[in-house]
């Protein structure tokens, strides 16, 4: 049973890769070469718009960036960002 689940997951992954091929274009190369482009501010929103006051206080000062080279200083990794076919690290402080 575990083998069937594993094979199904691999087949689904293969279909996803074929449906979303990675293309090496000049645009992607230009994006990687520009140092100012690696730090992009991201608006992060969680849950219900009427959230509790405790949640509002803790999320009010949350600032996140999509970084290509990892998090800096007091930031910590909170996931990934995607811009086109490029994946970045979501760093929040």
Curated annotation (Swiss-Prot):
Pfam families: Defensin_1 (PF00323), Defensin_propep (PF00879). Transmembrane segments: none annotated. It is found in: Secreted. SMART domains: Defensin_propep (SM01418), DEFSN (SM00048). InterPro entries: Alpha-defensin, Alpha-defensin_C, Alpha-defensin_N, Beta/alpha-defensin_C. SUPFAM superfamilies: Defensin-like. GO terms for biological process: defense response to bacterium. One of its GO terms (cellular component) is extracellular space. Disulfide bonds join 64-92, 66-81, 71-91. Keywords: Antibiotic, Antimicrobial, Defensin, Disulfide bond, Secreted, Signal. Its main location: secreted. Paneth cells of the small bowel. The keyword Nucleotide-binding does not apply. PANTHER family: ALPHA-DEFENSIN 1 (PTHR11876), ALPHA-DEFENSIN 1-RELATED (PTHR11876:SF2). This is Alpha-defensin 16. It comes from Mus musculus (Mouse). The lineage of its organism: Eukaryota, Metazoa, Chordata, Craniata, Vertebrata.
């Amino acid at each position: 049973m575990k083998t069937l689940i594993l094979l199904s997951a691999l087949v689904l992954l293969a279909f996803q890769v074929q449906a979303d091929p990675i293309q090496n274009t000049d645009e992607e190369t230009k994006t990687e070469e520009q140092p100012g482009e690696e730090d992009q501010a991201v608006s992060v929103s969680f849950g219900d718009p009427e959230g509790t006051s405790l949640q509002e206080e803790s999320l009010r000062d949350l600032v996140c960036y999509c970084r290509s080279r990892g998090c800096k200083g007091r930031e910590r990794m909170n996931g990934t960002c995607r811009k086109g076919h490029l994946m970045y690290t979501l760093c929040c402080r």
